[in-house]
Amino acid sequence: MATVKVTLIKSVSGRIPNHKLCVKGLGLRRIGHTVEVQDTPENRGMINKAYYMLKVEG
């Protein structure tokens, strides 16, 4: 299955609680942290919800 690189580029401090949980669910911990996640509908949904804090490649 294809993977997607996701990087946290903005802080989760002061954000909507559900968006914070999406970032946590993707495995991101701090600004500049990059993870590779599988390109599934569940992960795409989390990325789309918190898109303004993330950089997505692939």
Curated annotation (Swiss-Prot):
It comes from the Bacteria. SUPFAM superfamilies: Ribosomal protein L30p/L7e (SSF55129). GO terms for biological process: translation. GO terms for cellular component: cytosolic large ribosomal subunit. Pfam families: Ribosomal_L30. GO terms for molecular function: structural constituent of ribosome. Keywords: Ribonucleoprotein, Ribosomal protein. Belongs to the universal ribosomal protein uL30 family. Part of the 50S ribosomal subunit. PANTHER family: LARGE RIBOSOMAL SUBUNIT PROTEIN UL30M (PTHR15892:SF2), MITOCHONDRIAL RIBOSOMAL PROTEIN L30 (PTHR15892). This is Large ribosomal subunit protein uL30.
